[in-house]
């Protein structure tokens, strides 16, 4: 009797098909029964949204965008077209120029978006923080196997100062530094992210102050009262000169907000704290369950403003917000004798 040689494979295929359908059905039921993820922020946020403050905005996003918002409307927008990197630090100067560090370099542009100065990071190096000193100098840190601090003279195109920096791992460039800021005293506060500490350096590179328990230290700011504001992970805290915590914001203080990756935190003149919440820049954001990009918090930890703008306009992830409600001269700083 002639046997159908294909009957066995056919039967196996049929059984396999039933198994796949069954598994798919179970997966669908499981997905249906799985509880929905909690909202990343309240449906209605406190404050006036985009109209709460005038501000300059930039974030670590794939599209590398920056915005100026006034009166609740975007009045200026810029897209870095280099096609690589992320904007980790940016400052709007009093003359309208914008300085920004974008991982693979530092660039200064005019209000009409012309490049006034640029420095490209060498191969295998990264730059995530930069700050203007006056209108003619820039201080920045270059991550790499030989990490260094630089002060560049824009007019001459030369480096006026170069200083080696200590890191936890010279073979892991990306995680070494994210943020550093000059103080009124002319020292340089550096968040050593890969060493979980904050160090204050003078112009010679000498350590004048340090805090060693700053886990995932992302940003740092010296406050008018002499204390220091530190942010990183899901935590923001203010420490005194002895390193003691005198104020702290944790995830437990924000049960209605999914704040797990805080980047720059800034103490405002009114005493409130502005906290930027980063969202994965290579992912997509569901507008119906979108997190707040930034929140303003009172000293007693009440949220008085929440910014959520993922559509019309889509500001993208938030790393830095510079409020523009009052005139300021952010470039009015110095590093020791360098002014």
PLM regions: where:
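Alpha-helical and His/Cys-centered functional microenvironments
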Residues: 6, 17-18, 32
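Sec/Tat signal peptide C-region and signal peptidase I cleavage site
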Residues: 25-26
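A general, composition-driven signal for non-globular sequence regions
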Residues: 2, 20-22, 42, 91
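Bacterial N-terminal signal peptides that target proteins for export
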Residues: 2-14
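Histidine-/acidic-rich catalytic cores in large beta-rich domains
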Residues: 29-339
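Bacterial N-terminal signal peptides
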Residues: 12-22
């Amino acid at each position: 009797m002639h046997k159908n040689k294909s009957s066995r494979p056919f039967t196996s295929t049929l059984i396999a098909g039933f198994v796949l359908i069954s598994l798919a059905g179970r997966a669908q039921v499981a997905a249906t029964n799985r509880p929905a993820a909690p909202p990343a922020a309240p449906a209605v946020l406190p404050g006036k949204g985009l109209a709460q403050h005038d501000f300059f905005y930039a974030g670590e996003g794939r599209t590398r965008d920056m915005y100026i918002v006034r009166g609740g409307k975007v009045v200026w927008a810029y897209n870095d077209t280099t096609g690589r990197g992320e904007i980790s630090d940016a400052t709007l100067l009093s003359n309208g120029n914008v300085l920004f560090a974008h991982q693979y370099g530092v660039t200064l542009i005019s209000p009409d978006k012309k490049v006034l100065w640029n420095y490209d990071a060498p191969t295998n190096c990264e730059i995530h923080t930069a700050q203007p000193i006056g209108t003619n100098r820039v201080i920045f840190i270059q991550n790499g196997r030989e990490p260094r601090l630089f002060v560049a003279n824009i007019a001459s195109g030369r480096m006026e100062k170069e200083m080696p920096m200590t890191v936890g791992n010279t073979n892991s460039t990306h995680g070494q530094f994210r943020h550093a800021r000059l103080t009124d005293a002319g020292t340089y506060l550096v968040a050593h992210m890969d060493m979980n500490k904050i160090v204050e350096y003078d112009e010679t590179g000498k350590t004048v102050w340090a805090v060693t328990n700053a886990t995932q230290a992302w940003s740092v700011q010296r406050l008018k009262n002499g204390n220091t504001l530190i942010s990183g992970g899901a935590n923001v805290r203010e420490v005194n000169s002895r390193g003691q915590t005198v104020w702290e914001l944790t995830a437990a203080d924000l049960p209605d907000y999914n704040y797990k990756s805080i980047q720059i935190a800034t103490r405002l003149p009114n005493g409130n704290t502005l906290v930027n919440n980063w969202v994965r820049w290579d992912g997509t954001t569901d507008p119906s369950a979108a997190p707040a990009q930034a929140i303003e918090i009172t000293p007693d930890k009440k949220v008085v403003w929440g910014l959520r703008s993922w559509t019309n306009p889509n500001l993208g992830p938030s790393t830095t917000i510079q409020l523009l409600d009052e005139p300021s001269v952010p470039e009015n700083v110095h590093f020791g004798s360098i002014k």
